[in-house]
Amino acid sequence: MPEGPEIRRAADNLEAAIKGKPLTDVWFAFPQLKSYQSRLIGQHVTHVETRGKALLTHFSNDLTLYSHNQLYGVWRVVDTGEEPQTTRVLRVKLQTADKTILLYSASDIEMLTPEQLTTHPFLQRVGPDVLDPNLTPEVVKERLLSPRFRNRQFAGLLLDQAFLAGLGNYLRVEILWQVGLTGNHKAKDLNAAQLDALAHALLDIPRLSYATRGQVDENKYHGALFRFKVFHRDGEPCERCGGIIEKTTLSSRPFYWCPGCQH
């Protein structure tokens, strides 16, 4: 399943295609959304927001399309008039004069008013998004030490969207490797330096992944570009200590770590 950085890049692609352009055609598959089709013609998308793995497509008439891709949903951008050859089931079409965005296969789709945005069950449950530029390490540290989270093992906590939205399995293992901790550690047991390092890594690594993952290091950025240090690298030597990276299962998900320097 895509994690926060991949969801944010998808949102960027949608914004680049249709943001600010009048909608010339709107179509929804679900009957409960049909009445919104005519209300959105002539309106435009103001911005696309991510809340963890959910997308909020905001329109100029203050309505917001909530969509969660879950396992199978996918957005595509096409030239207007193009009909992709696919076996997926179309759920949403938002068309402008030159570009159209299409949502396939998702089942969790709703239209929300500003009031409903503040009471939506999923949006109420999720924590701050790690890619929110206004989220600071100080706020993350406060959440780590809060009564709700301080006694939780990181193996489960870093997958819990109520703690921080947008984290997932590859980010979980890369963050813990970066700070030299295991999945069994808890925030209440860390010293001040460890807490500070973890709070920064919880933001820095997702943001680096969002900004640079998939780019080729052609200009020799000396490690600044995101790349996996332990994820899917079991059996390989750890670049930090030379120990052998191992794979186990924690919180029902594959977990990669180096016993030599994560303890």
From Swiss-Prot:
The entry's keywords: DNA damage, DNA repair, DNA-binding, Glycosidase, Hydrolase, Lyase, Metal-binding, Multifunctional enzyme, Zinc, Zinc-finger
A Gene Ontology biological process term: base-excision repair
InterPro entries (alphabetical): DNA_glyclase/AP_lyase_DNA-bd, DNA_glyclase_Znf_dom_DNA_BS, EcNei-like_N, Endonuclease-VIII, FPG_cat, MutM-like_N-ter, Ribosomal_uS13-like_H2TH, Znf_DNA_glyclase/AP_lyase
EC number(s) given by UniProt: 3.2.2.-, 4.2.99.18
Pfam (any one): H2TH
Active site residues according to the UniProt entry: 2-3, 53, 253
Superkingdom per UniProt: Bacteria
Stretches annotated zinc finger (FPG-type): 229-263
Catalytic activity from the UniProt record: 2'-deoxyribonucleotide-(2'-deoxyribose 5'-phosphate)-2'-deoxyribonucleotide-DNA = a 3'-end 2'-deoxyribonucleotide-(2,3-dehydro-2,3-deoxyribose 5'-phosphate)-DNA + a 5'-end 5'-phospho-2'-deoxyribonucleoside-DNA + H(+)
One of the record's GO molecular function terms: zinc ion binding
Binding site for DNA: 70, 125, 169
Requisite cofactors: Zn(2+)
Entry note: cofactor: Binds 1 zinc ion per subunit.
HAMAP family noted in UniProt: Endonuclease_8
Family: Belongs to the FPG family.
Family matches, as NCBIfam families: PRK10445.1
Record's function text: Involved in base excision repair of DNA damaged by oxidation or by mutagenic agents. Acts as a DNA glycosylase that recognizes and removes damaged bases. Has a preference for oxidized pyrimidines, such as thymine glycol, 5,6-dihydrouracil and 5,6-dihydrothymine. Has AP (apurinic/apyrimidinic) lyase activity and introduces nicks in the DNA strand. Cleaves the DNA backbone by beta-delta elimination to generate a single-strand break at the site of the removed base with both 3'- and 5'-phosphates.
Designated name of the protein: Endonuclease 8
Species this protein is from: Escherichia coli O6:H1 (strain CFT073 / ATCC 700928 / UPEC)
